Amino acid sequence: MSELSNIKTLEELFEYWKTKQSNDSGKETCNSENGYVVATNSFYKDGIVNPEEYQNSALKVLFITNEVSIDCKNDVDEKNPELKGNGKGGHLVGNNKGNTVCSFNRYISDDEQETWSGKMRIKFGEMYRIMTEENYKTKDSIDAKANKEALKKIAFMNLNKRGGFGSIQRDVFLNYLKKYKECIRKEIELIAPDVIVWCACNTYDAEEYMGAIFEEKVWKEKKLTLKKGKVPILRMWHPSVQ
């Protein structure tokens, strides 16, 4: 029996996943660029933004993107000696206590401005409203309040929990997906969405990477079979695309 079969919550999964990552050499699964190497124990939690709102929402939507873009100026070993890995004479980067759900909630509560590439959080809120509001109409200006209310009802996950440098390093990313595919599947199962929005049209070969996680027929049918039944997968442009 898989160790994952006994895991019942996202928090339990993330602890298991992070420990497994930390014990991985990272040789084939950690991004590196310009003297920076992603730490093996770098881990950005994600998941359900507001569990109560999500469970009570008319449509449970999970947005999936590839990986966090690491801030190498601030999330670096010089400022965080707890980062582990092989810096290869350069610097380890990442965040061993990262949490994108906290970032969503800081934005919702006006404690943080929208600084994500392409105004991602704004666009996720807009996407959710387009999918769920019967009389939704595009306006010249964004309804920030309505969008923030919408964000409370979504779930969000990155596939590569370590993070990267803003553009996919194909081989490393593919190796990561293959190595941690059971964890990725488990997270989706625990989130239990009604619809998956795969934000991938312009960032990587979705068919290849989808195939590394799921059986080929899943992508061809555009439906993922969970305990609750078949869940449709919508493929959209990544929110950072202008």
Label the predicted regions.
Residues 1-15, 170-185, 203-242:
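C-terminal capping/extension of enzyme domains
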Residues 2-191, 195, 201:
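A polyanion-binding, active-site-adjacent surface
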